[in-house]
Regions:
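Conserved, structured core segments of small domains
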Residues: 1-103
Length: 103
C-alpha cells in the first residue's frame, strides 16, 4: 500500500542540530530508495520539509519507516493512504449504481 508522507522540520530545531541530522536523513532516504520502499521524494521549497511516497505491505513497516527517520523527533508529519485513480473510479462507480428493485 502506498502512503504520502509530508514532513516538516519543527521551527524550534536549532540550525546546528538540523545541519548535523540532515545528512543522516539523506542517507536514510537513499537506503529506502535502494530497498524500493521509497518511490518518490521531493523537497518542499521554502518549507524546510519533504514529501515522500512509500510503498509498504503493513502498518508495522510504515511505522518502522517513520520511526527510524533520523529527524523523527524534530519533525511534524502528516500521513495519507493513497489509491490509484482507477481504483477510486471503480469504487465511485459501484457506489453510484442504483440498487436493484425490492431492496
Amino acid at each position: 500500500m502506498k502512503f504520502l508522507i509530508i514532513q516538516k522540520i519543527k521551527r524550534e530545531v536549532p540550525i546546528e542540530k538540523w545541519a548535523k541530522m540532515l545528512p543522516l536523513q539523506f542517507k536514510y532516504f537513499e537506503n529506502l530508495e535502494k530497498e524500493k520502499t521509497l518511490e518518490v521524494y521531493y523537497h518542499l521549497i521554502g518549507q524546510q520539509g519533504s514529501m515522500l511516497i512509500v510503498n509498504v505491505d503493513s502498518d508495522e513497516k510504515l511505522s518502522k519507516i517513520v520511526g527510524q527517520d533520523p529527524m523523527f523527533f524534530d519533525s511534524e508529519r502528516e500521513i495519507y493512504p493513497l489509491t490509484t485513480r482507477q481504483t477510486h473510479e471503480k469504487q465511485i462507480r459501484e457506489l453510484l449504481q442504483p440498487e436493484p428493485a425490492g431492496f
